[in-house]
């Protein structure tokens, strides 16, 4: 199945960028960041933020379907040898108590938001060339109008791969893919009302939060909640390997991205609450879908902290050495595509990043609110 026209736009822009004088510096930065190889490396991007159109009023916060996470202090970040460079150093963090959704936002809940507001998600809109130009070298020519189509990224299992550091081998831009049509225009979410909503950009998640009177969790809040009251645990359930004992989360078993053995009972998304909750009563804090956090992404953020960080909200801006011009936010928790031999994003310390205007088949969110 051939790539959508928007993928051609991506390749077109990359070819232009490769002609710029700073290519050598960008390549050097890329080599320095090899240890950050992740589920998002070489991910096709829309290359343009979507303007906020959420001019609706916020609702009064309801704590139904939420659980109160107690205040506490914990060691944030990795302490073993499994983490990537951006998970170090481990550091002390204090968080105040907050409420958190016990599950990822579902299709049913997101539909209520859409019905109430008429909001159109990023994936349902055509890319904005005027916004796109802001992230490209001055003088970049405009591609043909035919490539500016509403689309989103859908997973396709390839027959073979050359490198697990090149996610473009299994992600394709699909015209008409969005939260209502997760695999494209011929798919739907009928009977999947209790599944996590996907193809959600950071902008979309923020719009939903505004409508519900809630917010996205900070990265520190997310990790504290994911640990479920445990200390120095690798996973939300403790330290037992994910493929030992009973299935604990919706992840990928087998050879990623070619063959999933479905040992956990699922080939792609699972309904929320399909697996046991962690110590705080939170479901799917590992696997199923990546979850947006409010923080900008910088690989060196932890290294710049000192002492005990009190309710940290992340860096003031974004910087990803692999894509310096693309603003990115943090995503946490891993997805149904995470595998022990690949990103292992279901570890509680694992950090990933995605451009704010990008929606994918494995990305959703959950909300938090203050007391």
What is each of the regions a protein language model found here?
Residues 361-371:
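Short, structured beta-strand segments at or near domain termini in extracellular proteins/domains
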Residues 17-18:
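C-terminal motif of bacterial Sec signal peptides marking the signal peptidase cleavage site
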Residues 23-37, 42-46, 68-69, 75, ...:
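Functional-site microenvironments in short loops/helix caps that host divalent-cation chemistry
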Residues 98, 113-122, 212:
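Short capping motifs at secondary-structure boundaries
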Residues 38, 58-67:
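GGW-centered surface loops in extracellular recognition modules
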Residues 102, 107-114, 201-207, 223:
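Short, solvent-exposed alpha-helical surface patches in non-cytosolic proteins
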Residues 7-14:
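Sec-dependent N-terminal signal peptides
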Residues 1-4:
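Positively charged n-region of N-terminal signal peptides that target proteins for export
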């Amino acid at each position: 199945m051939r790539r959508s026209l928007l993928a051609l736009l991506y390749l077109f822009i990359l070819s232009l960028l490769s002609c710029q004088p700073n290519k050598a510096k960008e390549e050097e930065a890329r080599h320095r960041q090899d240890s950050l190889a992740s589920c998002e490396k070489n991910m096709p991007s829309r290359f343009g933020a979507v303007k906020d159109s959420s001019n609706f009023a916020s609702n009064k916060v309801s704590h139904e379907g939420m659980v109160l996470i107690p205040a506490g202090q914990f060691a944030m970040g990795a302490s073993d040898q499994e983490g990537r460079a951006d998970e170090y150093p481990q550091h002390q963090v204090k968080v105040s108590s907050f409420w958190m959704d016990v599950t990822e936002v579902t299709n049913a809940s997101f539909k209520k938001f859409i019905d109430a507001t008429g909001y159109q998600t990023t994936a349902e809109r055509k890319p904005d060339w005027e916004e796109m130009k802001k992230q490209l070298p001055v003088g970049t020519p405009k591609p043909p109008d035919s490539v500016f189509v509403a689309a989103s990224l859908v997973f396709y299992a390839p027959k073979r791969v050359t490198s697990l550091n090149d996610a473009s081998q299994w992600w394709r831009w699909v015209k008409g893919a969005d939260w209502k049509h997760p695999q494209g225009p011929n798919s739907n979410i009928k009977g999947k009302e209790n599944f996590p909503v996907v193809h959600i950009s950071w902008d979309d998640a923020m719009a939903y939060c505004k409508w519900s009177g809630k917010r996205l969790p900070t990265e520190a809040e997310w990790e504290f909640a994911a640990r479920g009251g445990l200390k120095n645990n690798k996973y939300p359930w403790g330290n037992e390997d994910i493929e030992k004992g009973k299935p604990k989360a919706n992840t990928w078993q087998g050879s990623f991205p070619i063959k999933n053995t479905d040992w956990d009972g699922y080939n792609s998304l699972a309904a929320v609450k399909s697996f046991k909750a962690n110590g705080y009563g939170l479901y799917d804090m590992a696997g199923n879908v990546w979850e947006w956090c409010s923080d900008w992404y910088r690989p060196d953020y932890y290294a710049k902290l000192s002492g005990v960080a009190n309710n940290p909200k992340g860096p003031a801006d974004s910087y990803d050495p692999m894509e310096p011009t693309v603003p990115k936010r943090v995503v946490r928790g891993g997805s149904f595509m995470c595998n022990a031999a690949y990103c292992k994003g279901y570890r509680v310390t694992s950090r990933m990043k995605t451009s704010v205007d990008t929606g994918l088949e494995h990305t959703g969110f959950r909300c938090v609110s203050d007391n």
